[in-house]
Amino acid sequence: MIVTTTSTIQGKEIIEYIDIVNGEAIMGANIVRDLFASVRDVVGGRAGAYESKLKEARDIAMEEMKTFARQKNANAIVGIDVDYEVVREGMLMVAVSGTAVRI
């Protein structure tokens, strides 16, 4: 499945705009605290454990969005947006959304 932040896919014609699709992942109660504690693990200016958890949450949200698109018989998603939010103390949410299309 093609997933892009752009509104078009170069070299492809969008046959049908189907619906808005989204996916969310919330990292639980101790994740944010543990991640900040792991900042001590900074190597070369980057916090490896923190980046790993963000990537995991983003991957979960993206897969959920793709699943919803497939259920609607889409074969691509355009115009995706990725947002990161602290929903309350100790909880991080990654939300992705886009438009499911058929090319």
Curated annotation (Swiss-Prot):
Pfam families named among the record's database cross-references: YbjQ_1
Cystine crosslinks: none
InterPro entries to which the protein is assigned, alphabetical: UPF0145_dom_sf, UPF0145_YbjQ-like
NCBIfam families: PRK12855.1, PRK12856.1
Family: Belongs to the UPF0145 family.
UniProt name for this protein: UPF0145 protein BCE_5284
Organism (species): Bacillus cereus (strain ATCC 10987 / NRS 248)
Lineage: Bacteria, Bacillati, Bacillota, Bacilli, Bacillales
